[in-house]
């Protein structure tokens, strides 16, 4: 199993969500996050552009079976890419175990309901 974390533009979230659902990735978490980097973003407030080093993004967190890693990465990349600086990053992290609290099931079987198996 792997945990895939993707930091994407807020404006691309709906496209990424739809791409993940189309790739049969049925569950993920997402969070509003801020980062600081060399690239600055301008914010417009009452018609004035303010320069800021704080960059607002969405962090998507998905745990998938090893066989679904590449299709998940490709779905995120295709939907999140604009070709501009600041499109984001994807991180792939090993997951040692997964436990379904309700049943005690362990391993990749705990990731999905039996009727959702693909």
For each feature predicted by the language model, list its residue ranges.
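Positively charged, small/polar-rich N-terminal and surface patches that mediate targeting and assembly
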Residues: 1-118
């Amino acid at each position: 199993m792997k945990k895939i974390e993707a930091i994407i533009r807020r404006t691309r979230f709906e496209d990424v969500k739809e791409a993940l659902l189309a790739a049969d990735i049925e569950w993920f978490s997402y969070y509003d996050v801020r980062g600081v980097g060399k690239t600055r973003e301008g914010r417009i407030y009452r018609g004035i552009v303010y320069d800021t080093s704080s960059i607002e993004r969405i962090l998507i967190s998905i745990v998938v079976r090893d066989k679904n890693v590449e299709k998940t990465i490709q779905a995120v990349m295709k939907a999140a890419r604009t070709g501009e600086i600041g499109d984001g990053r994807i991180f792939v992290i090993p997951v040692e175990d997964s436990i379904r609290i309700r049943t005690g099931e362990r391993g990749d079987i705990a990731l999905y309901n039996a009727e959702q198996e693909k």
